[in-house]
Amino acid sequence: MAYPEVPLWLDLARLARDFAVSGAAALRSRPDLAGVERHCLFIGAPRNGHSLIGALLDAHPQMVVAHELGVPRYLAARFSRRQVLCLLAANARREAARGRRHIHYSHAVPGQWQGRFRDLRVIGDKHGEGFLLSVQARPWLTATLLERFAPAYFIHVVRNPYDALASVATSSKRGQSPERAIAYFEGLYRTLELVRGQLAPERLFLLRFEQFLEAPRERLAETCAYLGVDAPAGYLDACAAIVLTRPGDQRGLVQCDAAA
């Protein structure tokens, strides 16, 4: 399992709460949501750099990118698009107030627009692993999302697979052996291929994490262009300033059975 299982009663209680809160928010006049032109969703295996990229995109004045809200889950529960947009904006505000912290890192970008926006054009969610797990459980969700959350633009961040696997295998939260982590990743990538088969090529953007770290300004500008927004120089400089020049090298921390 990727995450500890949540008791069914608690999951249903959270959905009921979110339905009521987002329903009330959706009834209010929200001219700020009227300009949304694209929906951005992440897709892929964990520990590949999705959280950093999502936090940097959320720092853009015309974008809101939530942290692991789980859009497919809400669409499966029959939430309206407007309700989901309200939940995404609220999630981004909370994450910004917390400093966009993830594991041991803060992805806060001082002086930029995390948790708020101006002239909103793009809204989405950073939950690449969660998206694939939702589709594994409900294969019809991809088609539903493409219909109800259109137009959807996907971002897939990839990293040296040995580093990503080692990060999962050494995580105290996940508690997976290297062999189980490998099997888990294989399942995710099989699902990823099924999803890719339903997407137009121009709706999937591949971003290599190591290349991003080498040239964060250039790669971030390319990502913004894919999403249809300009990338101001001040925004790019502020985002590049928080990026580590070298990722944690974790592949040497675990040993795998050669036969695995």
Located regions from the model:
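PAPS-dependent sulfotransferase catalytic domain
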Residues: 117-234, 252
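PAPS-dependent sulfotransferase catalytic core
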Residues: 1-115, 239-256
